[in-house]
């Protein structure tokens, strides 16, 4: 079965992101296909590489990166939602601030539009929102 996961919750103020990560890992471990994880609205904050949880908390940004690296899961972030929340990549930042070549988008995530999400909707058997 093909799954797409939609994450709309921020990394730490709700349970959405943690539940989405655990569900995504379970999908893979149960031999289903996880086509992509799409971060939208406050979910875009999951891609901020500068998030620094307490030492006794799970680092969700690193967990998402682990999932991407180990299973090649696509971590798609809505570009509009990300920019609205201050999550930017180097390319977007360079366009706006010519002299600053820094971004806070974690390298395992990539910015994309809702068109990409709609393409995954067409080929997924299930879309799960967190």
Swiss-Prot record:
Localization terms from the record: Cytoplasm
Top-level enzyme category: transferase
Matching Pfam families: DsrE
Listed name of the protein: Sulfurtransferase TusD
InterPro entries given in the database record: DsrEFH-like, Sulphur_relay_DsrE/F-like, Sulphur_relay_TusD/DsrE
Keywords recorded for this protein, A-Z: Cytoplasm, Transferase, tRNA processing
Predominant place of localization: cytoplasm
Similarity comment: Belongs to the DsrE/TusD family.
Function, in words: Part of a sulfur-relay system required for 2-thiolation of 5-methylaminomethyl-2-thiouridine (mnm(5)s(2)U) at tRNA wobble positions. Accepts sulfur from TusA and transfers it in turn to TusE.
Domain of life: Bacteria
Species name: Buchnera aphidicola subsp. Baizongia pistaciae (strain Bp)
GO terms for MF: sulfur carrier activity; sulfurtransferase activity
Alphabetical GO biological process terms: tRNA wobble position uridine thiolation
Record keyword Transcription regulation present: no
Entry annotation: catalytic residues: 78 (cysteine persulfide intermediate)
Signal peptide (from-to): none
GO cellular component, one term: sulfurtransferase complex
Keyword presence, Electron transport: no
Enzyme Commission (EC) number: 2.8.1.-
SUBUNIT field: Heterohexamer, formed by a dimer of trimers. The hexameric TusBCD complex contains 2 copies each of TusB, TusC and TusD. The TusBCD complex interacts with TusE.
């Amino acid at each position: 079965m093909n799954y797409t996961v939609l994450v709309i919750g921020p990394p730490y103020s709700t349970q959405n992101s943690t539940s989405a990560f655990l569900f995504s890992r379970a999908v893979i471990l149960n031999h289903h296909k996880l086509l992509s994880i799409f971060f939208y609205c406050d979910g875009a904050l999951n891609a901020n590489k500068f998030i620094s949880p307490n030492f006794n908390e799970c680092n969700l940004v690193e967990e998402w990166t682990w999932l991407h690296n180990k299973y090649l899961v696509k971590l798609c972030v809505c570009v509009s939602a990300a920019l609205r929340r201050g999550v930017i990549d180097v390319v977007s930042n360079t366009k706006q601030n010519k002299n600053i070549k820094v971004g806070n988008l974690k390298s395992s995530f990539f910015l994309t539009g809702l068109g990409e999400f709609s393409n995954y909707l067409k080929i997924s058997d299930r879309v799960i929102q967190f």
